[in-house]
């Protein structure tokens, strides 16, 4: 189906040369940190598929920009995972619902990596091998505060100081 990141992350030109020589689509993963990276790689012909990881591109806003660049250039996108907790998985599920995410993603059930997670309900895989996007507001998951408290080692409170002139520092 694809070769995912077959060369070094900073080797965009050789990815382009490889993609010209083979029929199998090259999928860039670690090479894509922004929509500009995606635009550049697509323009060079370095890939025919892009993997987006929220943590790598810096969050939803940039992930949406990468998805838009790919969609405008008919480049399929899929969501990669990085062993996230249920909170991170919830973000990945939300991202994977965007129109350009046309390939199966790398989001799995919480239980694959965590005996007990910090979010509820658990992310589960259906008998068909799919994940269902929650229908609740927001990300559709709640935090298991009892679990978080049991894992908490220390709590700190950060207070923003206000100067005599009323400016915060």
Mark where each language-model region is.
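Ubiquitous "structural anchor" signal
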Residues: 94, 100, 137, 146-148
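Shared catalytic-loop signature of beta/alpha-barrel
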Residues: 2, 8-27, 32-130
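Residue-level recognition of conserved structural "scaffold" positions that shape functional pockets
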Residues: 65, 87, 136, 145-147
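Extended hydrophobic packing segments that form well-structured cores
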Residues: 139-169
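C-terminal accessory segments
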Residues: 127-139, 145
């Amino acid at each position: 189906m694809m070769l995912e990141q077959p060369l070094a992350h900073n080797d965009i030109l050789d990815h382009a040369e490889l993609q010209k020589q083979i029929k199998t689509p090259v999928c860039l993963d670690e090479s894509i940190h922004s929509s500009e990276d995606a635009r550049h790689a697509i323009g060079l012909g370095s890939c025919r598929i892009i993997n987006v990881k929220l943590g790598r591109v810096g969050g939803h806003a940039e992930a949406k920009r990468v998805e838009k660049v790919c969609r405008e250039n008919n480049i399929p996108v899929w969501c990669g995972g990085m062993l996230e907790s249920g909170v991170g998985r919830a973000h990945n599920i939300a991202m994977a619902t965007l129109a350009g995410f046309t390939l199966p993603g790398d989001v799995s059930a919480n239980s694959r990596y965590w005996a007990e997670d910090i979010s509820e309900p658990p992310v589960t895989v259906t008998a068909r091998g799919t994940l269902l996007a929650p229908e609740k507001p927001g990300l559709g998951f709640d935090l298991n505060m009892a679990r978080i408290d049991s894992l908490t080692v220390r709590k700190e409170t950060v207070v923003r100081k206000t100067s005599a002139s009323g400016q915060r520092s």
